[in-house]
């Protein structure tokens, strides 16, 4: 990327800075059936929900591994994972971001099929690698809007062989045959709060109220990024970077963590809960509670 040039006095102002990052929501085909059996177990103790998983999805996936046409070179392999979550999570004093000053700190949570929700890419500007001394994590690529080798489920594979979702897990959700007239529990966040898909009560504290689609309070910024194309990206806001979006309080039905307080079928006395939405952020980027270290990349 580069910026340069100027405007003659009285001429129309133009944007001389062009980004080389392409907006793309293309996905790889899902036509691979895995030979592994999906393992997901929960053990409830007095204070904890202990989940064990092998991270193998219970649906078809894209082609991964060192074969022609693969979406990335990492083959899917079984994992041996254990997560300990609080049964009665509490809110932190302030929201805790998944992305830290030096890169991703946490994955967000786990689906009821044992696959992690891991929305944050490790792709900081100027795209020289996460360990580059020039890495600007304020401008990190949005995985669902850039060609990072995701399959039709918004998933791909880490070098360890762990399959994970960067966006709404399409095939998993389709296979659930979800009801449109009730709230559907689909997983748990790293802080222990439940995750639901898309729909919730119109009155958050009235379980007899109608079910409606939840809406995010994020929107795409307008105008041109302030960067020079060298230390920070330039060109128009288009969703390629997470920072292309802004949170507007009460723009939608959900808060900055893409959740809200209310009653649910599983929590009739009320709880905080997250919603997976179709629109950005899709998978939340903040925790309302204190995340388990089992989801911490730096532990």
Regions found by a protein language model. Name each.
Residues 80-82, 105-107, 150, 160-164, ...:
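Extracellular structured ligand-interaction cores
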Residues 138, 143-175:
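Aromatic- and glycine-enriched beta-alpha-beta binding-site module
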Residues 112-153, 228-260:
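Short, flexible domain-boundary/linker segments around small modular repeats
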Residues 1-2:
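C-terminal motif of bacterial Sec signal peptides marking the signal peptidase cleavage site
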């Amino acid at each position: 990327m580069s910026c340069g040039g100027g405007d003659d006095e009285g001429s129309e102002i133009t944007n001389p800075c062009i980004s080389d990052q392409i907006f793309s929501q293309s996905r790889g085909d899902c036509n691979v059936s895995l030979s592994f059996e999906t393992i997901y177990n929960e053990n409830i103790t007095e204070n904890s929900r202990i989940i064990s998983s092998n991270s193998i999805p219970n649906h078809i996936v894209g082609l991964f591994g060192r074969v022609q046409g693969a979406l990335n070179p990492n083959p899917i392999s079984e994992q041996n994972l254990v997560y300990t979550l609080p049964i009665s999570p509490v809110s932190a004093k302030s929201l805790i971001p998944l992305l830290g000053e030096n890169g991703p700190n946490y994955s967000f949570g786990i689906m009821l099929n044992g696959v992690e929700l891991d929305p944050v890419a490790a792709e900081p500007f100027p795209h020289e690698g996460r360990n580059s001394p020039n890495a600007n994590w304020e401008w990190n690529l949005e995985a669902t809007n850039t060609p990072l080798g995701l399959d039709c489920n918004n998933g791909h594979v880490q070098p360890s062989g762990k399959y994970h979702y960067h966006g709404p897990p399409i095939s998993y959700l389709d296979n659930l045959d979800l009801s449109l007239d009730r709230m559907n529990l689909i997983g748990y966040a790293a802080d222990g709060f439940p995750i639901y898909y898309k729909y919730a009560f119109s009155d958050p504290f009235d379980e007899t109220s109608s079910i409606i689609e939840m809406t995010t309070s994020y929107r795409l910024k307008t105008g041109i990024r302030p960067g020079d194309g060298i230390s920070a990206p330039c060109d128009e806001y288009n969703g390629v970077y997470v920072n292309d979006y802004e949170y507007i309080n009460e723009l939608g039905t959900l808060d900055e963590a893409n959740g809200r307080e209310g009653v649910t079928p599983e929590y009739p006395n009320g709880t905080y809960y997250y919603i997976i939405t179709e629109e950005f952020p899709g998978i939340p980027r903040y925790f309302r509670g204190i995340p388990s270290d089992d989801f911490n990349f730096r532990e």
